[in-house]
Amino acid sequence: MEFGDLRIDESLIKTCQEKGITRPTEVQRQVIPAVLGGGDVIAVSQTGSGKTLAFVLPIVSHLLQKNRSFYCLVVAPTRELSSQIAECFNMFQATGLRVCLLVGGANFNVQANQLSKRPHVVVGTPGRIAEHVLKTKSFRTERVRKFVLDEADRFFEQDFVEDLETIIPSLREKRQTLLFTATMSDEISKLSSSILKRPKTIRTAEKYETVPALKEYYLFVAMKWKNSALVELLEMSQGMSVIVFVSMCVTARVMSLALARLGFCSEALHGELSQEKREEAMRSFKESRFNVLVCTDLGSRGLDISHVDLVINFDVPKSGKDYIHRVGRTARAGRSGTAITLVTQYDVEQIQKIEFTLEKKLEEFKMMKKNFGTICARIEEAIQEAQETLKEERKRNRRP
Protein backbone atom coordinates (compact mmCIF):
# COMPACT_ATOMS: atom_id res chain seq x y z
CA MET A 1 0.00 0.00 0.00
CA GLU A 2 1.23 3.50 -0.90
CA PHE A 3 0.39 6.90 0.63
CA GLY A 4 -1.65 7.66 -2.49
CA ASP A 5 -3.93 4.71 -1.68
CA LEU A 6 -4.74 6.38 1.67
CA ARG A 7 -6.31 9.46 0.00
CA ILE A 8 -3.56 11.79 1.21
CA ASP A 9 -3.07 15.02 -0.76
CA GLU A 10 -0.39 14.70 -3.45
CA SER A 11 1.54 17.75 -2.21
CA LEU A 12 1.89 16.16 1.25
CA ILE A 13 3.05 12.87 -0.27
CA LYS A 14 5.71 14.77 -2.24
CA THR A 15 6.95 16.45 0.95
CA CYS A 16 7.19 13.05 2.66
CA GLN A 17 9.17 11.64 -0.27
CA GLU A 18 11.59 14.57 -0.10
CA LYS A 19 12.18 13.62 3.56
CA GLY A 20 12.85 10.01 2.61
CA ILE A 21 9.42 8.75 3.75
CA THR A 22 8.22 6.70 0.80
CA ARG A 23 5.85 4.05 2.19
CA PRO A 24 3.38 4.12 5.10
CA THR A 25 4.11 2.04 8.20
CA GLU A 26 1.55 -0.41 9.59
CA VAL A 27 0.13 2.09 12.10
CA GLN A 28 -0.13 4.73 9.35
CA ARG A 29 -1.95 2.30 7.03
CA GLN A 30 -4.55 1.66 9.72
CA VAL A 31 -4.84 5.03 11.46
CA ILE A 32 -4.88 7.43 8.50
CA PRO A 33 -8.15 6.09 6.96
CA ALA A 34 -9.77 6.04 10.42
CA VAL A 35 -8.83 9.69 11.06
CA LEU A 36 -9.96 10.75 7.59
CA GLY A 37 -13.26 8.99 8.32
CA GLY A 38 -13.95 11.46 11.12
CA GLY A 39 -14.62 9.10 14.04
CA ASP A 40 -12.81 8.87 17.37
CA VAL A 41 -9.76 6.59 17.45
CA ILE A 42 -7.72 4.72 20.07
CA ALA A 43 -4.40 3.50 18.68
CA VAL A 44 -2.17 1.16 20.67
CA SER A 45 1.16 1.07 18.88
CA GLN A 46 4.81 0.34 19.46
CA THR A 47 7.13 3.24 20.04
CA GLY A 48 8.96 4.07 16.82
CA SER A 49 6.09 2.90 14.64
CA GLY A 50 5.51 6.23 12.89
CA LYS A 51 2.36 7.15 14.82
CA THR A 52 3.03 10.92 14.78
CA LEU A 53 2.77 11.09 11.01
CA ALA A 54 -0.30 8.83 11.28
CA PHE A 55 -2.30 11.72 12.73
CA VAL A 56 -0.37 14.66 11.25
CA LEU A 57 -1.01 13.68 7.60
CA PRO A 58 -4.82 13.33 7.77
CA ILE A 59 -5.16 16.45 9.92
CA VAL A 60 -3.15 18.57 7.47
CA SER A 61 -5.12 16.99 4.60
CA HIS A 62 -8.35 18.17 6.20
CA LEU A 63 -6.89 21.66 6.70
CA LEU A 64 -6.03 21.88 3.01
CA GLN A 65 -9.71 21.37 2.24
CA LYS A 66 -10.94 23.92 4.77
CA ASN A 67 -8.66 26.52 6.35
CA ARG A 68 -9.59 26.93 10.04
CA SER A 69 -7.71 28.53 12.92
CA PHE A 70 -7.40 26.51 16.15
CA TYR A 71 -8.42 23.45 14.15
CA CYS A 72 -6.25 20.97 16.05
CA LEU A 73 -4.93 20.70 19.62
CA VAL A 74 -2.28 18.08 20.42
CA VAL A 75 -1.36 17.34 24.04
CA ALA A 76 1.85 15.42 24.77
CA PRO A 77 3.47 14.54 28.12
CA THR A 78 6.92 16.08 27.59
CA ARG A 79 8.45 19.20 26.10
CA GLU A 80 10.68 17.09 23.88
CA LEU A 81 7.81 15.08 22.40
CA SER A 82 5.76 18.26 21.92
CA SER A 83 8.66 19.82 20.01
CA GLN A 84 9.01 16.72 17.84
CA ILE A 85 5.29 16.76 16.99
CA ALA A 86 5.41 20.48 16.15
CA GLU A 87 8.41 19.77 13.88
CA CYS A 88 6.43 17.05 12.13
CA PHE A 89 3.56 19.48 11.43
CA ASN A 90 6.09 22.10 10.30
CA MET A 91 7.29 19.74 7.56
CA PHE A 92 4.19 20.98 5.73
CA GLN A 93 4.50 24.71 6.43
CA ALA A 94 4.85 25.34 2.68
CA THR A 95 1.07 24.82 2.59
CA GLY A 96 0.67 27.91 4.80
CA LEU A 97 0.21 25.85 7.96
CA ARG A 98 0.67 27.84 11.18
CA VAL A 99 1.80 25.86 14.24
CA CYS A 100 2.12 27.11 17.82
CA LEU A 101 4.17 25.27 20.47
CA LEU A 102 3.15 25.69 24.13
CA VAL A 103 5.65 24.23 26.60
CA GLY A 104 7.03 25.24 29.98
CA GLY A 105 10.46 26.84 30.11
CA ALA A 106 9.55 29.18 27.24
CA ASN A 107 8.23 32.74 27.54
CA PHE A 108 4.50 32.73 28.35
CA ASN A 109 3.81 36.16 26.82
CA VAL A 110 5.55 35.27 23.56
CA GLN A 111 3.34 32.17 23.37
CA ALA A 112 0.23 34.27 24.08
CA ASN A 113 1.22 36.56 21.20
CA GLN A 114 1.58 33.55 18.90
CA LEU A 115 -1.91 32.38 19.92
CA SER A 116 -3.31 35.81 19.01
CA LYS A 117 -2.14 35.14 15.43
CA ARG A 118 -4.69 32.31 15.21
CA PRO A 119 -2.58 29.22 14.44
CA HIS A 120 -4.14 26.20 12.76
CA VAL A 121 -2.46 23.72 15.10
CA VAL A 122 -1.47 24.05 18.76
CA VAL A 123 0.89 21.49 20.30
CA GLY A 124 2.07 21.42 23.90
CA THR A 125 2.36 19.95 27.36
CA PRO A 126 -0.67 19.69 29.68
CA GLY A 127 0.54 22.20 32.28
CA ARG A 128 1.32 25.04 29.88
CA ILE A 129 -1.77 24.44 27.74
CA ALA A 130 -3.97 24.49 30.86
CA GLU A 131 -2.32 27.74 31.94
CA HIS A 132 -3.13 29.38 28.60
CA VAL A 133 -6.70 28.04 28.72
CA LEU A 134 -7.16 29.90 32.01
CA LYS A 135 -5.23 33.09 31.20
CA THR A 136 -5.07 33.72 27.43
CA LYS A 137 -8.32 35.01 25.94
CA SER A 138 -7.11 34.63 22.36
CA PHE A 139 -6.69 30.86 22.86
CA ARG A 140 -9.98 29.75 21.26
CA THR A 141 -10.12 26.12 22.38
CA GLU A 142 -13.85 26.01 21.72
CA ARG A 143 -12.96 26.03 18.00
CA VAL A 144 -10.86 22.84 18.20
CA ARG A 145 -12.20 20.11 15.91
CA LYS A 146 -9.32 17.62 16.22
CA PHE A 147 -8.11 16.80 19.73
CA VAL A 148 -5.08 14.50 20.03
CA LEU A 149 -3.68 12.90 23.19
CA ASP A 150 -0.28 11.42 22.36
CA GLU A 151 1.47 8.87 24.61
CA ALA A 152 -1.57 9.06 26.88
CA ASP A 153 -0.24 6.37 29.22
CA ARG A 154 2.42 8.86 30.34
CA PHE A 155 -0.15 11.38 31.62
CA PHE A 156 -0.93 9.19 34.59
CA GLU A 157 2.73 8.56 35.41
CA GLN A 158 3.33 12.30 35.70
CA ASP A 159 0.01 13.23 37.32
CA PHE A 160 -1.35 15.48 34.55
CA VAL A 161 -4.96 14.55 35.32
CA GLU A 162 -5.77 17.93 36.88
CA ASP A 163 -4.44 19.77 33.81
CA LEU A 164 -6.54 17.57 31.51
CA GLU A 165 -9.57 18.38 33.65
CA THR A 166 -8.93 22.05 32.81
CA ILE A 167 -8.32 21.51 29.09
CA ILE A 168 -11.02 19.02 28.07
CA PRO A 169 -14.12 20.92 29.35
CA SER A 170 -12.98 23.98 27.38
CA LEU A 171 -13.30 22.08 24.09
CA ARG A 172 -16.37 21.90 21.89
CA GLU A 173 -18.55 18.83 22.35
CA LYS A 174 -18.59 18.03 18.64
CA ARG A 175 -15.00 17.11 17.84
CA GLN A 176 -12.84 14.19 16.77
CA THR A 177 -10.65 12.79 19.55
CA LEU A 178 -7.58 10.67 18.84
CA LEU A 179 -5.83 8.83 21.66
CA PHE A 180 -2.42 7.22 21.15
CA THR A 181 -0.78 4.99 23.72
CA ALA A 182 2.06 2.47 23.85
CA THR A 183 0.23 0.35 26.42
CA MET A 184 -3.39 -0.12 27.48
CA SER A 185 -4.22 0.22 31.20
CA ASP A 186 -7.23 0.66 33.46
CA GLU A 187 -6.52 4.41 33.61
CA ILE A 188 -6.43 4.67 29.82
CA SER A 189 -9.67 2.69 29.51
CA LYS A 190 -11.35 4.99 32.03
CA LEU A 191 -10.08 8.13 30.26
CA SER A 192 -11.12 6.90 26.82
CA SER A 193 -14.63 5.99 27.97
CA SER A 194 -15.10 9.50 29.37
CA ILE A 195 -13.88 11.54 26.38
CA LEU A 196 -14.27 9.33 23.28
CA LYS A 197 -17.50 8.40 21.52
CA ARG A 198 -17.73 4.92 19.98
CA PRO A 199 -14.02 4.91 19.11
CA LYS A 200 -12.39 2.65 16.58
CA THR A 201 -9.65 0.72 18.39
CA ILE A 202 -6.51 -0.02 16.40
CA ARG A 203 -3.83 -2.30 17.78
CA THR A 204 -0.52 -2.63 16.00
CA ALA A 205 1.23 -3.82 19.16
CA GLU A 206 0.40 -5.94 22.13
CA LYS A 207 1.36 -4.79 25.59
CA TYR A 208 5.10 -4.65 26.31
CA GLU A 209 6.40 -5.54 22.87
CA THR A 210 9.46 -4.32 21.00
CA VAL A 211 9.71 -4.03 17.22
CA PRO A 212 10.94 -7.05 15.20
CA ALA A 213 13.73 -5.02 13.53
CA LEU A 214 15.39 -4.44 16.91
CA LYS A 215 18.28 -6.69 17.96
CA GLU A 216 18.35 -6.89 21.77
CA TYR A 217 21.27 -8.03 23.90
CA TYR A 218 22.55 -7.95 27.45
CA LEU A 219 26.25 -7.71 28.34
CA PHE A 220 27.12 -9.25 31.69
CA VAL A 221 30.02 -7.37 33.25
CA ALA A 222 31.42 -7.01 36.79
CA MET A 223 30.61 -3.64 38.36
CA LYS A 224 34.29 -2.64 38.42
CA TRP A 225 34.50 -3.06 34.62
CA LYS A 226 31.19 -1.34 33.80
CA ASN A 227 32.77 1.94 32.66
CA SER A 228 35.34 0.03 30.62
CA ALA A 229 32.59 -1.95 28.90
CA LEU A 230 30.87 1.27 27.86
CA VAL A 231 34.06 2.69 26.36
CA GLU A 232 34.78 -0.58 24.54
CA LEU A 233 31.24 -0.63 23.08
CA LEU A 234 31.60 2.95 21.88
CA GLU A 235 34.99 2.22 20.33
CA MET A 236 33.41 -0.73 18.51
CA SER A 237 30.64 1.62 17.29
CA GLN A 238 32.79 4.38 15.77
CA GLY A 239 30.77 6.36 13.24
CA MET A 240 27.43 5.13 14.59
CA SER A 241 24.76 7.27 16.20
CA VAL A 242 24.46 6.13 19.83
CA ILE A 243 22.21 6.95 22.79
CA VAL A 244 23.54 5.97 26.23
CA PHE A 245 20.86 5.82 28.94
CA VAL A 246 21.78 6.47 32.57
CA SER A 247 19.59 6.72 35.65
CA MET A 248 20.70 10.07 37.13
CA CYS A 249 21.34 13.61 35.85
CA VAL A 250 24.76 13.76 37.52
CA THR A 251 25.79 10.52 35.79
CA ALA A 252 24.74 11.97 32.43
CA ARG A 253 26.83 15.10 33.02
CA VAL A 254 29.92 13.27 34.29
CA MET A 255 29.89 10.49 31.67
CA SER A 256 29.31 12.92 28.81
CA LEU A 257 32.31 15.03 29.85
CA ALA A 258 34.46 11.97 30.53
CA LEU A 259 33.68 10.44 27.14
CA ALA A 260 34.46 13.75 25.44
CA ARG A 261 37.87 13.74 27.18
CA LEU A 262 38.49 10.31 25.70
CA GLY A 263 37.85 11.65 22.21
CA PHE A 264 34.18 10.75 21.70
CA CYS A 265 31.81 13.40 20.33
CA SER A 266 29.35 13.31 23.22
CA GLU A 267 26.75 15.59 24.83
CA ALA A 268 24.29 15.19 27.70
CA LEU A 269 20.49 15.51 27.82
CA HIS A 270 18.83 15.56 31.23
CA GLY A 271 16.18 17.30 33.33
CA GLU A 272 18.51 19.89 34.87
CA LEU A 273 19.18 21.53 31.51
CA SER A 274 17.20 24.61 30.50
CA GLN A 275 14.62 24.14 27.76
CA GLU A 276 16.85 26.06 25.35
CA LYS A 277 19.82 23.77 26.04
CA ARG A 278 17.66 20.64 25.75
CA GLU A 279 16.43 21.74 22.35
CA GLU A 280 19.96 22.61 21.23
CA ALA A 281 21.25 19.19 22.32
CA MET A 282 18.47 17.38 20.43
CA ARG A 283 18.88 19.54 17.34
CA SER A 284 22.66 19.01 17.28
CA PHE A 285 22.28 15.24 17.70
CA LYS A 286 19.69 15.14 14.95
CA GLU A 287 22.02 17.07 12.65
CA SER A 288 24.90 14.67 13.51
CA ARG A 289 27.07 17.41 15.03
CA PHE A 290 27.90 14.79 17.65
CA ASN A 291 27.12 11.08 17.68
CA VAL A 292 26.95 10.02 21.34
CA LEU A 293 24.04 11.32 23.42
CA VAL A 294 24.15 10.48 27.14
CA CYS A 295 20.71 10.97 28.63
CA THR A 296 18.32 10.14 31.43
CA ASP A 297 14.82 8.74 30.94
CA LEU A 298 13.78 12.30 30.08
CA GLY A 299 14.94 11.42 26.58
CA SER A 300 13.42 7.96 26.35
CA ARG A 301 10.25 9.44 24.87
CA GLY A 302 9.93 12.23 22.40
CA LEU A 303 13.27 11.64 20.67
CA ASP A 304 12.10 10.93 17.14
CA ILE A 305 15.48 10.58 15.45
CA SER A 306 15.56 8.26 12.49
CA HIS A 307 19.28 7.54 12.38
CA VAL A 308 19.97 6.11 15.88
CA ASP A 309 21.94 2.91 15.32
CA LEU A 310 22.56 1.79 18.88
CA VAL A 311 21.00 2.23 22.32
CA ILE A 312 23.16 1.33 25.33
CA ASN A 313 21.45 0.95 28.69
CA PHE A 314 24.41 1.87 30.91
CA ASP A 315 22.04 1.60 33.89
CA VAL A 316 19.36 -1.10 33.78
CA PRO A 317 15.85 0.42 33.36
CA LYS A 318 13.50 0.36 36.37
CA SER A 319 10.76 -1.57 34.56
CA GLY A 320 9.87 -3.40 31.37
CA LYS A 321 7.87 -0.39 30.28
CA ASP A 322 10.88 1.93 30.72
CA TYR A 323 13.01 -0.59 28.83
CA ILE A 324 10.63 -0.51 25.86
CA HIS A 325 10.62 3.27 25.70
CA ARG A 326 14.41 3.46 25.91
CA VAL A 327 15.20 0.86 23.27
CA GLY A 328 12.41 2.31 21.11
CA ARG A 329 14.76 5.19 20.24
CA THR A 330 16.34 2.88 17.65
CA ALA A 331 14.80 0.61 14.99
CA ARG A 332 12.16 3.25 14.25
CA ALA A 333 9.69 3.28 11.35
CA GLY A 334 10.92 0.04 9.79
CA ARG A 335 14.66 0.65 10.18
CA SER A 336 16.90 -1.81 12.01
CA GLY A 337 18.75 -1.07 15.25
CA THR A 338 20.53 -2.59 18.23
CA ALA A 339 20.06 -2.28 22.00
CA ILE A 340 22.61 -3.50 24.55
CA THR A 341 21.93 -3.47 28.30
CA LEU A 342 24.88 -3.60 30.70
CA VAL A 343 24.11 -6.03 33.53
CA THR A 344 26.31 -6.21 36.63
CA GLN A 345 26.12 -8.75 39.43
CA TYR A 346 23.74 -6.34 41.18
CA ASP A 347 21.30 -6.10 38.23
CA VAL A 348 20.53 -9.77 37.59
CA GLU A 349 17.18 -9.77 39.39
CA GLN A 350 16.07 -6.57 37.65
CA ILE A 351 16.92 -7.78 34.14
CA GLN A 352 15.08 -11.03 34.87
CA LYS A 353 11.97 -9.00 35.79
CA ILE A 354 12.26 -7.11 32.51
CA GLU A 355 12.59 -10.36 30.56
CA PHE A 356 9.52 -11.70 32.37
CA THR A 357 7.56 -8.59 31.35
CA LEU A 358 8.75 -8.89 27.74
CA GLU A 359 8.03 -12.63 27.78
CA LYS A 360 11.38 -13.36 26.16
CA LYS A 361 15.05 -13.81 27.00
CA LEU A 362 17.60 -11.28 25.81
CA GLU A 363 20.54 -12.69 23.89
CA GLU A 364 23.98 -12.40 25.51
CA PHE A 365 26.38 -10.00 23.80
CA LYS A 366 29.84 -11.55 23.57
CA MET A 367 32.81 -9.23 24.07
CA MET A 368 36.53 -9.72 24.59
CA LYS A 369 37.34 -8.21 27.99
CA LYS A 370 41.13 -8.46 27.94
CA ASN A 371 41.52 -4.69 27.36
CA PHE A 372 39.28 -3.67 30.24
CA GLY A 373 42.21 -3.10 32.63
CA THR A 374 43.89 -0.60 30.30
CA ILE A 375 40.60 1.09 29.45
CA CYS A 376 39.67 1.30 33.14
CA ALA A 377 42.65 3.53 33.98
CA ARG A 378 41.77 5.91 31.10
CA ILE A 379 38.06 6.20 31.88
CA GLU A 380 38.57 6.56 35.64
CA GLU A 381 41.01 9.41 35.07
CA ALA A 382 38.58 11.06 32.65
CA ILE A 383 35.71 10.69 35.15
CA GLN A 384 37.82 12.26 37.90
CA GLU A 385 38.67 15.21 35.63
CA ALA A 386 34.98 15.58 34.67
CA GLN A 387 33.95 15.62 38.33
CA GLU A 388 36.54 18.33 39.04
CA THR A 389 35.25 20.39 36.11
CA LEU A 390 31.66 20.17 37.38
CA LYS A 391 32.81 21.02 40.90
CA GLU A 392 34.49 24.19 39.60
CA GLU A 393 31.35 25.06 37.62
CA ARG A 394 29.22 24.80 40.76
CA LYS A 395 31.64 27.06 42.64
CA ARG A 396 31.49 29.70 39.89
CA ASN A 397 27.70 29.56 39.80
CA ARG A 398 27.50 30.10 43.57
CA ARG A 399 29.60 33.25 43.45
CA PRO A 400 27.58 36.50 43.74
Swiss-Prot record:
A Gene Ontology BP annotation from the UniProt entry: rRNA processing
Protein's UniProt keywords contain Nucleus: yes
One Pfam family hit: Helicase_C
Gene3D superfamilies on file: P-loop containing nucleotide triphosphate hydrolases
A single GO molecular function term of this UniProt record: ATP binding
Record has Plastid as a keyword: no
Domain of life: Eukaryota
Subunit details: Interacts with the SSU processome.
Name of the protein in its database record: ATP-dependent rRNA helicase RRP3
